[in-house]
């Protein structure tokens, strides 16, 4: 059953590709220039070419037929192709019969065939061909009335009966007329089929729109037609034909530079229409999806597909290519200019793919560094991919500076590549810190602060680079060529990459400063108080050699409580508000619960849970990106929720951080 479904899926795509190719050909065909060429040629007196408007109408009819073929249900589409195949077989039978009659007229032998070996060979060959045609036609049309397709065998039968050759010519024409009448009868009997199909399709569309709406109808058609795969196959066929046409006309092998130019030129030739441009967009999306899937498979193996079976990635790169192509008017340029512009757009797409690869690798690498996994192969894969993401973007930026004149788009590519390399450098530095802490007997002090400073340095550099890009874009807009699309891109880039990042970084800094001030304002527990308390930290579940005391008389590690205060300003146990003289400006707070009577220090909360009625304070959760969240990764190999075992997990900065993140 699975094989049948796969075959149907393949047919659903393969049978619709010709309709898109027909649309592409009709878009390329200029009717006016075609008639101008006809008028200059000897065909200008042909009545068929005297009616220009008729040809224009036929041009639009071709568009309608292409759209109908594209949207037909699979069963009707298969039936239509079978009818078309039957027509081709009948034409092949006509050609076989006509060639046989011509050969007999050339040799002019009217005697018995068994006396002439050559005549017998011609008869046998034609008879076998006609039998094959008749058999195939009856199989395709699923009928046992084989005589309906055997009219072209009449000249063979007449020759077998020693009919004169002049009469055989007349019989052959009669066979052609008879077959044509059969085709006309079939078309006439099915004349109302398209109308009935259109009527039933209209009823179904109206019902779907009334019940589910236009959006559901569009999504249903999108899934039934498999639009991304369909356009990708269409573009790959165009690209393969372009490559084949080039190599079929050349005898000598091309050099490496020539092959690169051929590759770009072929891509440029295959995106000269809106249909081929959409095909390139979906092809780039699938290529990006494949690269990102291989990246995740390289890092995690088959577990990557078990944890994340549906990777909805790759569309960002395709949409980026489409926006840039529309903005720059790609399909309206000449082939050479189009190839040059495509090279720049593809650089932008590659930079986006590298950034997506880093988004996949960053949490995996940090989780591997924070875990107790000692598999050298896993560490090698993670570090090798990070080294690739460190070197390749820098090399790409260097090549762009070498071969292209600097402008706004190239500056965006170079800045994105540099930021990717810097982010990988920060990821590797944090990974090294985790590994150093793993091999030390004692935990690294202030690990959380070190990680924060590393991330803060990267965020600051990222902000400065984004600011430089905006400044360069504004200067080009003022002193250079001004466009609406360019101004919109600068505005969007300024809002998302400058303003929001600056606002987020400032809030993060204020939250951290407020947490530090709160910790400093709390009293430090003495040795006698710790011995009298004789309990573990309720955040990290580790023994307490030093602790701070909250106003509600609860004991915590200073580092653990500080990380908790990054998230919310309440006691982890009783949720009493920890007041401080310096309130965080711009961040509101909600009413908190009063301390529960008899709340004990040894109350154990599950990870990721909250007491009934308690919600996170809006606006207090820090969102600094994937790397900031990964500094609170659990050290447990099984990644299960629950309480820590103090004997199994030694006291470290990473262990303390885990409950804070889950909170």
UniProtKB/Swiss-Prot annotation:
| Region of interest called Disordered, as start-end residue ranges on this chain | 607-663
Q: What is the catalytic activity of this protein?
A: S-ubiquitinyl-[E2 ubiquitin-conjugating enzyme]-L-cysteine + [acceptor protein]-L-lysine = [E2 ubiquitin-conjugating enzyme]-L-cysteine + N(6)-ubiquitinyl-[acceptor protein]-L-lysine
Uppermost EC category: transferase
Q: Where are the zinc fingers (RING-type)?
A: 537-575
Q: What is its main location?
A: endoplasmic reticulum
Q: Which residues form the active site?
A: 537
So what EC number does this one have? 2.3.2.27
Q: What GO terms in the biological process aspect are recorded for it?
A: ERAD pathway; proteasome-mediated ubiquitin-dependent protein catabolic process
Sorted alphabetically, the Gene Ontology cellular component annotations on this record are:
endomembrane system; endoplasmic reticulum membrane
Q: Which GO terms describe its molecular function?
A: ubiquitin protein ligase activity; zinc ion binding
Give the compositionally biased regions (Basic and acidic residues): 624-663
Give the residue interval(s) assigned to the motif YLYF motif.
81-84
Q: Which keywords does the record carry?
A: Endoplasmic reticulum, Membrane, Metal-binding, Transferase, Transmembrane, Transmembrane helix, Ubl conjugation pathway, Zinc, Zinc-finger
Q: Indicate whether Ion transport appears among the record's keywords.
A: no
One matching Pfam family: zf-RING_2
Residue ranges spanning the membrane: these are 53-73, 77-97, 123-143, 146-166, 168-188, 205-222, 225-245, 275-295, 316-336, 340-360, 384-404, 410-430, 460-480, 482-502
Going by the entry's taxonomy, the superkingdom of the source organism is recorded as Eukaryota
Per UniProt, subcellular location reads as: Endoplasmic reticulum membrane
Q: How does it sit in the membrane?
A: Multi-pass membrane protein
Q: Matching PANTHER family, A to Z?
A: RING FINGER PROTEIN 145, RING ZINC FINGER PROTEIN
On subunit structure and binding partners, the annotation says: Interacts (via YLYF motif) with INSIG1 and INSIG2.
Its biological purpose: E3 ubiquitin ligase that catalyzes the direct transfer of ubiquitin from E2 ubiquitin-conjugating enzyme to a specific substrate. In response to bacterial infection, negatively regulates the phagocyte oxidative burst by controlling the turnover of the NADPH oxidase complex subunits. Promotes monoubiquitination of CYBA and 'Lys-48'-linked polyubiquitination and degradation of CYBB NADPH oxidase catalytic subunits, both essential for the generation of antimicrobial reactive oxygen species. Involved in the maintenance of cholesterol homeostasis.
- What name has this protein been given in UniProt? RING finger protein 145
């Amino acid at each position: 059953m699975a094989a049948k479904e796969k075959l149907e899926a393949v047919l659903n795509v393969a049978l619709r590709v010709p309709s898109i190719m027909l649309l592409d050909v009709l878009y390329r065909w200029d009717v006016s220039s075609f008639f101008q060429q006809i008028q200059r040629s000897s065909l200008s007196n042909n009545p068929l070419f005297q009616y220009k408007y008729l040809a224009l109408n036929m041009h639009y009819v071709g568009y309608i037929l292409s759209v109908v073929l594209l949207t037909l249900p699979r069963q009707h589409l298969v039936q239509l192709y079978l009818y078309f195949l039957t027509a081709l077989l009948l034409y092949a039978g006509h050609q076989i019969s006509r060639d046989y009659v011509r050969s007999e007229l050339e040799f002019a032998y009217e005697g018995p065939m068994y006396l002439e070996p050559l005549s017998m060979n011609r008869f046998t060959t034609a008879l076998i061909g006609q039998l094959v045609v008749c058999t195939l036609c009856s199989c395709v049309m699923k009928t046992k009335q084989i005589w309906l397709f055997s009219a072209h065998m009449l000249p063979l039968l007449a020759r077998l009966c020693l009919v004169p050759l002049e009469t055989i010519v007349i019989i052959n024409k009669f066979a052609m007329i008879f077959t044509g009448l059969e085709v006309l009868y079939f078309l006439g009997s099915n004349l109302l089929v398209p109308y009935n199909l259109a009527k039933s399709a209209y009823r179904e569309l109206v019902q779907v729109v009334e019940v589910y709406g236009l959006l559901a109808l569009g999504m249903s058609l999108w899934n039934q037609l498999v639009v991304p795969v369909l356009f990708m196959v269409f573009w790959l066929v165009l690209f393969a034909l372009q490559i084949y046409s080039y190599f079929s006309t050349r005898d000598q092998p091309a050099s490496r530079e020539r092959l690169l130019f051929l590759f770009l030129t072929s891509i440029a030739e295959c995106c000269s229409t809106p249909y081929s441009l959409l095909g390139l967009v979906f092809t780039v999306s699938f290529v990006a999806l494949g690269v990102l899937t291989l990246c995740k498979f390289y890092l995690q193996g088959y577990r990557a597909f078990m944890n994340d079976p549906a990777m909805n990635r790759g569309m960002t790169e395709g949409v980026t290519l489409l926006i840039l192509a529309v903005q720059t008017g790609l399909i309206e340029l000449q082939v050479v200019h189009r190839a040059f512009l495509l090279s720049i757009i593809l650089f932008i797409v590659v930079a986006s793919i590298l950034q997506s690869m880093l988004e996949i690798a960053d949490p995996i690498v940090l989780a591997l560094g924070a875990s107790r996994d000692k598999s050298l192969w896993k560490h090698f894969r993670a570090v090798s991919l990070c080294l690739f993401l460190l070197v390749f973007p820098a090399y790409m930026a260097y090549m762009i500076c070498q071969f292209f004149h600097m402008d706004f788009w190239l500056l965006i590519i170079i800045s994105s590549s540099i930021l990717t390399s810097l982010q990988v450098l920060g990821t590797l530095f944090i990974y090294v810190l985790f590994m150093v802490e793993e091999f030390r007997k004692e935990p690294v002090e202030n690990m959380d602060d070190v990680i924060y400073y590393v991330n803060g340095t990267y965020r600051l550099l990222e902000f400065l680079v984004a600011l430089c890009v905006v400044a360069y874009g504004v200067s080009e807009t003022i002193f250079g060529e001004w466009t609406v699309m360019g101004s919109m891109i600068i505005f969007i880039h300024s809002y998302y990459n400058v303003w929001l990042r600056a606002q987020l970084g400032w809030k993060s800094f204020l939250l951290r400063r407020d947490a530090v001030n709160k910790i400093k304002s709390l009293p430090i527990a003495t040795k006698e108080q710790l011995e009298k308390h004789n309990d573990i930290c309720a955040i990290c579940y580790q023994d307490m050699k030093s602790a701070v005391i909250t106003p509600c008389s609860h004991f915590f590690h200073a580092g653990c409580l500080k990380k908790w205060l990054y998230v919310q300003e309440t006691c982890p146990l009783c949720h009493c508000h920890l007041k401080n003289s310096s309130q965080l400006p711009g961040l509101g707070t909600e009413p908190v619960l009063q301390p529960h009577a008899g709340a004990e220090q040894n109350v154990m909360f599950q990870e990721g849970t909250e007491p009934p009625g308690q919600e996170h304070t809006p606006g207090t959760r820090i969102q600094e990106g994937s790397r900031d969240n990964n500094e609170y990764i659990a050290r447990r190999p099984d990644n299960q929720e629950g309480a820590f075992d103090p004997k199994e997990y030694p006291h470290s900065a990473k262990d303390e951080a885990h409950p804070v993140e889950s909170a």
